[in-house]
């Protein structure tokens, strides 16, 4: 473990039930699920880098689906998204012990996530923000994993060198992005086959 640890959110620190969003939101909008999902996942990346707000995202999705984006409906969709996000996210049992142990060792902690605008509220409510030195969210900084730029930005915020940092993520491609700038990447795979060098638990990284 280096002097700094960069940690992903979704799939690493917490689980989320995106399939619930994929079912409930199109029902609320009165749109066929397949039509909604095709439009949503084509447009959603713009939200992940802060180019559109969640409300603007739903306006665009509704228009693409041939539905008039009534202001009331858009508000309902945004509210439902946040409600589902907060209700269905669950910290993995090793997440807070891992972050707390890092703090006790004096290891700087950065949260690095590809996400939309409501993630900060979520991770604040779960106690993650209080344990972090730096929080880098793609929607706020306009940078996204696996681009090396988001890792360089995070290292700059932490004021540490790449060789002194470790990055933990459930996506192998994102770990490779960190390694491209000299940060050691560790993939966490909680279920299924364990690739070489990957870990099953965050606590395995502590040594």
Briefly describe each language-model feature range.
Residues 1-7, 96, 100-101, 107, ...:
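Asp-based, Mg2+/Mn2+-dependent phosphohydrolase catalytic module
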Residues 66, 102-103:
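Hydrophobic alpha-helical bundle segments that form small-molecule/ligand-binding pockets
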Residues 1-93:
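N-terminal helical cap/lid subdomain that shapes the substrate entry/recognition surface
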């Amino acid at each position: 473990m280096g002097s700094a640890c960069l940690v992903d959110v979704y799939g690493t620190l917490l689980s989320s039930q995106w399939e619930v969003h994929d079912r409930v939101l199109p029902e609320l909008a009165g749109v066929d699920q397949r039509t909604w999902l095709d439009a949503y996942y084509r447009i959603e990346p713009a939200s992940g880098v802060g180019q559109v707000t969640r409300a603007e995202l739903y306006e665009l999705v509704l228009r693409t689906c041939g539905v008039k984006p009534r202001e009331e409906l858009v508000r309902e969709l945004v509210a439902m998204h946040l409600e589902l996000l907060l209700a269905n996210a669950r910290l993995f049992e090793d997440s807070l012990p891992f972050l707390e142990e890092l703090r006790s060792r004096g290891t700087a902690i950065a949260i690095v996530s590809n996400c939309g605008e409501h993630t900060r509220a979520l991770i604040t409510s779960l106690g993650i923000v209080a344990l972090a030195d730096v929080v880098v969210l793609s929607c706020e900084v306009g940078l996204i994993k696996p681009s090396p730029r988001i890792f360089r930005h995070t290292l700059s915020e932490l004021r540490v060198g790449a060789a002194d940092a470790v990055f933990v993520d459930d996506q192998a491609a994102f770990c490779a992005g960190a390694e491209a700038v000299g940060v050691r990447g560790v993939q966490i795979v909680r279920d299924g086959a364990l690739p070489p060098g990957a870990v099953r638990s965050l606590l395995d990284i502590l040594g």
